[in-house]
Amino acid sequence: MTNKEKALELIGTFVSGDSVKAKKLLAKDYIQHNLAYGTGADAFIGAVEYLASSPVKTTVNNIRAFEDGDKVFLHTVYNFAGTGEQVAFDIFRFDADGKIAEHWDNLAAKAEVNPSGHTQIDGTLEKKNVDREETRKVVSEFVGDVLRGENLDKFASYFDGDNYIQHNTAIADGVSGVGAALEAMAKQGIQMIYNKTHFVLADGDYALAVSEGSFAGAATTFYDLFRVENGKIAEHWDVMETLADKATWQNQNGKF
């Protein structure tokens, strides 16, 4: 079984309630960075058993799955025990024994279509067999130059004219859509700041950048998935999550 298959099996236990399978897949000292859950394999297994006992069943719909070295990253829609659909990016790290040893994620409520009629999950599904390192390089440089604001003069150079498919819930397609959204935010005094990027994971023509910063003054984590075409940024999906108050954390591992 590939690591990607193992990760999909693990999230499937939220539906099946198969705690035995979850235990087999997880390293005992599993490190959890979702701050709403305890750390360790036992805490994960407890969540599986709790969801299995709920009168409203959990649903899991994986949309995209990728692998990069010892990490798998997934784009999935969850509905935990009928609490409402959430769009998530999950990252799982595998240890030398092939066990799932660490997990990071970002979740956001599923929203209505954006100004261009796209959802948070639709769009291109096919993955092209191109050099992941080229993809990683383009996305890493874009995140630094543009999202972290280190060289904003290069903004337009990352796109093929105004061709850019946008899945952010509030922004329209095109470079022009980004410009209009930033202008509207500025008028409202809203700043979106990327301070540090922790991961840029790549598989084929897709790369997921994981960053921290702030949105409208609140500490925020940003998961941005990009599809690269002919060396240009062609499509974007994202999940932003406000960092929970530390007093509510169920583990002390931090978001990263």
PLM region spans:
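C-terminal and inter-domain tail/linker signature
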Residues: 1-256
